[in-house]
From Swiss-Prot:
The gene is TFAM. The modification Phosphothreonine is found at residue 122. Binds DNA via its HMG boxes. When bound to the mitochondrial light strand promoter, bends DNA into a U-turn shape, each HMG box bending the DNA by 90 degrees. Residues 1-42 form a transit peptide. The keyword Transit peptide applies. Binds to the mitochondrial light strand promoter and functions in mitochondrial transcription regulation. Component of the mitochondrial transcription initiation complex, composed at least of TFB2M, TFAM and POLRMT that is required for basal transcription of mitochondrial DNA. In this complex, TFAM recruits POLRMT to a specific promoter whereas TFB2M induces structural changes in POLRMT to enable promoter opening and trapping of the DNA non-template strand. Required for accurate and efficient promoter recognition by the mitochondrial RNA polymerase. It comes from Sus scrofa (Pig). Keywords: Activator, DNA-binding, Mitochondrion, Mitochondrion nucleoid, Phosphoprotein, Repeat, Transcription, Transcription regulation, Transit peptide. Monomer; binds DNA as a monomer. Homodimer. Component of the mitochondrial transcription initiation complex, composed at least of TFB2M, TFAM and POLRMT. In this complex TFAM recruits POLRMT to the promoter whereas TFB2M induces structural changes in POLRMT to enable promoter opening and trapping of the DNA non-template strand. Upon metabolic stress, forms a complex composed of FOXO3, SIRT3, TFAM and POLRMT. Interacts with TFB1M and TFB2M. Interacts with CLPX; this enhances DNA-binding. PANTHER family: HIGH MOBILITY GROUP PROTEIN DSP1, TRANSCRIPTION FACTOR A, MITOCHONDRIAL. This is Transcription factor A, mitochondrial.
Length: 246
């Protein structure tokens, strides 16, 4: 199971979909939500749901990001987000209010539209499809969250030694079906000596340090722009402790 999770992570990082077969198990790699069955009529109803409005800061970031990218074409997204966050902090309250008012107005329209669509469903339909509704919402919420975090420049999670090895060898492998490549690479990993594996173990440790430092900096930025909801519990506890000591 751990191997499947590892391969799924690598395929995702390489832009592969769940349609790629796992060389080890020979079955399709499924998304955690792929088991959910949603009737066609209900899918069409949910697809008509409006998107949640962007928060004031996200709206501001989305407007500014293309401008900053044009001015700094070689800069990383995380660097640009940091500059945008600084610009947002310095923005006068009167200008911030424009974005906040726009968010409140969009939220009101969003609620009204959702209520209108929900009223079209009969009570029996709502009861019988309660689980499917929840799964659909969770999937959509996870996708929105992922896109938002990407736009906000959240650092990528550290990779394991095995994932680093696969990513490296996958790009070097000859053209062919993904499942064949993965099977070959997996066998190569098993045949590595302890000293050879140690190289990738060290790279994984270095990646953990990179992730820790980038996350610390990123979470500090999120606190500054009022996105405490994105902060890990350990970070919140540490910040609270520092405040009490002061």
């Amino acid at each position: 199971m751990a191997l499947l999770r590892g391969v799924w992570g690598v395929l995702s990082a390489l832009g592969k979909s769940g349609a790629d077969l796992c060389a080890v198990c020979g079955s399709r790699l499924r998304s955690p939500f792929s088991f959910a069955y949603v009737p066609r009529w209900f899918s069409s109803t949910l697809s008509g749901f409006p998107k949640k409005p962007m928060t004031s800061y996200v709206r501001f970031s989305k407007e500014q990001l293309p401008i900053f990218k044009a001015q700094n074409p070689d800069a990383k997204n995380s660097e640009l987000i940091k500059k945008i966050a600084e610009l947002w902090r310095e923005l006068p309250d009167s200008e911030k209010k424009i974005y906040e008012d726009a968010y409140r107005a969009d939220w009101q329209v969003y609620k009204e539209e959702v209520n209108r669509i929900q009223e079209q469903l009969t009570p029996s339909q709502m009861v019988s499809l309660e689980k499917e509704i929840m799964q659909k919402r969770l999937k959509k919420k996870a996708l929105i969250k992922k896109r938002e975090l990407t736009m906000l420049g959240k650092p990528k999670r550290p990779r394991s030694a095995y994932n680093i090895f696969i990513a490296e060898r996958f790009q070097e492998a000859k053209d062919g079906p993904s499942q064949v490549k993965l099977k070959t690479i997996n066998e190569n990993w098993k045949n590595l000596s302890s000293s050879q594996k140690q190289v990738y173990i060290q790279l994984a440790e270095d990646d953990k340090v990179r992730y820790y430092n980038e996350m610390k900096s990123w979470e500090e930025q999120m606190v500054e722009v009022g996105r405490n909801d994105l902060i890990r519990r350990s970070m919140k506890h540490s910040a609270k402790k520092d405040t009490e000591e002061c």
